[in-house]
Amino acid sequence: MPTSTICLSFDFDAISAWLTSWSSGRSRPSAVDISRGEFGARVGAPRILDLLKKYDIEATWFVPGHTADTFPDICKRVSREGHEIGYHGYAHEADPRPEEEAEIFKLAMTALKKVYGRDPVGYRFPGLDLADFTIDRLLENGFLYDSSLMGDDFHLYRVRRGDQWSLKGPYKFGSETRLVEIPFSWYLDDWPAFTFSWDPFRYAFTAVDTVYQYWKRHFDYMHECIEDGVYTLCTHPQVIGRAHLITMLEDLIRHMKKANGVRFCQLQEVATEYNKAHPVANP
């Protein structure tokens, strides 16, 4: 494996997040918020695809089933241009119960297969948390990896299940599964820095240069100090697709490509390589 691996990932929430995770309990969807999601599909995603094509990069897109059903043409373009599509819930459900998740999974798999032509092997939880019942469902359905946790920054590891906690004793770690974890970080995500919201109030007008330095310094440290590091960036078409941010992403790509021993990969590729290098005794 080269010295540094870059994984660009895009959470293609589109309208779905404004119907669930960011609905703020409204009785009906906000037309303004819906239009923000629509921008991601109509404008942001095509800009990103054009940028990736310009630099010959194949990325990973985590697509809710709702996005695939609502915007099939752009989702088919994502697949047609060689990008990986991962599972991201159906309507960006942040905290489903086990019985709800079973239906969500079925709906999402049906929608994604229509645009991707095959079942996804990767998952990012919309609520960025993992319950044991979710892990079990992923394992039962042959998933290769998850990218929702933050237990490392530049190294892959195995997802655990069966952790136990108490306020009267130490935290007890469960057992490792065969599911590979490709860690995520809020510091390498565009949503917290740039997504304005009235309710709950989020200012989110962070200076572009400030976030660029976050992302660049993460890369520079990894490339200089970490052997075989994996840098995973999480962005959203309705955010990173804005004019002032798509140019920032291009600046970052240019900076990374100037370094020696750097490659861009899909998440499924690095997970497969990790499995080969660290085989599971009892898969």
Model-derived features: positions:
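Conserved, mostly hydrophobic/aromatic
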Residues: 11, 52, 88, 123, ...
